[in-house]
Amino acid sequence: MPPVDNAYKLRNQEFLQEYAQKPGVKIMFNGVMYREITKGHGQKPSPKSFISVYYTGKLINGKVFDQTQKGKPATFRLNELITGWITALREMPAGSRWEIVSPYNLGYGSRPAGAIKAFSTLIFDITLLDVR
């Protein structure tokens, strides 16, 4: 395992503290934060639900590491996703669009995952289209 980049880890912790102070940000029981962009009125998913979403995932520097293609939503089983998504999406009605911020321990943790460095805070813009 590569050595820990303590400066990077600290920048991510500082980002979380700053984000928590933004207007409209709600903090969930485990530290996931979200900001409602569009309020939906549909069904909320359960852990075994299949969800269809549009999303963009980026790091605190704004670098996009993953996203759906325009017009092609992704479908997932909720309980197979990272904890940050599971926590937020369980409370998100279909039709909603939220910005979700997941601390590293609820994302990919202390190990790198492809282009995502260890200790990365993950920022997602998620539109929940459908719950089945």
Question: PLM features: residue spans?
Answer:
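Cross-family detector of peptidyl-prolyl cis-trans isomerase
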Residues: 1-132
